[in-house]
A protein has these predicted regions:
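Active-site mouth loops of central-metabolism enzymes
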Residues: 7-28, 72-82, 108-115, 142-156
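Glycine-rich, positively charged N-terminal anion/phosphate-binding segment
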Residues: 25-73, 79-87, 92-93
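Glycine-rich, proline-tolerant flexible connector loops at the mouths of alpha/beta enzymes
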Residues: 41-66, 99-114, 144-148, 173-184
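Alpha-helix-loop-beta-strand connector modules within alpha/beta enzyme cores
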Residues: 53-77, 116-138, 161-162, 185-200
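Distinct, well-ordered alpha-helical segments
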Residues: 56-57, 87-92, 148-157, 182-193
Length: 200
């Protein structure tokens, strides 16, 4: 295990995206600023997703434009497709995240694609990020358990993680989406994952 860990705060994106009452831009910026002031060095600010799907994050461009960027803080964003990537680049975002899941049912219900289709959708996004010197995090949800399919075998999650990493992600986020992971399962999955030392 590494001697240190890096915390990535996703509250401004993941925490707010399902709120029914629209949070004003100023309040979102104040939230991000408070997190940075607390010492967090990477904050996922928003998502460049279709406003039709996530109205709460329709103001992503506005939030990034008005945010006071601190030199020692990475401000990242979730980017689901090329349209979102173009918006992120226009805002000067220097790190993005793409999102899929280890189970087919969760993929279909959450992003309306199969796992394979999600990887195909991310290929041009990651390539464009690399062309522009933008770092990429790959999210893998339901790595331990799925609300629809139950327990996920470590081998299944490891194969999905490998395919996500092979897109060119600089780091992987392995998600315990429904909160059922236990030390033996975590150890089993991490033991199957191989990731270059220059990536995390």
């Amino acid at each position: 295990l590494p001697a240190t860990i890096a915390l990535v705060e996703v509250g401004p994106r993941d925490g707010l995206q399902n709120e029914r009452e629209i949070v004003p831009v100023g309040a979102k910026i104040a939230f991000v600023d408070a997190l940075a002031e607390a010492g967090l060095r990477e904050i996922e600010v928003s998502s460049f997703v279709s406003p039709k799907w996530v109205p709460q994050l329709a103001d992503a461009s506005d939030v990034f434009a008005k945010l006071k960027h601190r030199e020692n803080v990475v401000y990242s964003a979730l980017v689901p497709n090329m349209k979102g990537m173009e918006r992120a680049l226009a805002c000067g975002v220097r790190k993005i995240a793409v999102f899929t899941a280890a189970t087919e049912t969760f993929c279909k219900k959450n992003i309306n694609m199969t796992f394979a289709e999600s990887l195909q959708a991310f290929l041009p996004v990651v390539a464009e990020a690399k062309r522009n010197g933008v770092a990429v995090r790959g999210y893998l949800s339901t790595a331990f358990g799925c609300p629809y399919e139950g327990n996920v075998p470590p081998t299944q999650a490891a194969i999905a993680a490998r395919r996500l990493a092979d897109l060119g992600c600089d780091e992987l986020s392995i998600g315990d989406t429904i909160g059922i992971a236990a030390p033996p399962g975590v150890e089993a999955l991490l033991g199957l994952l191989k990731f270059p030392r220059d990536r995390t």
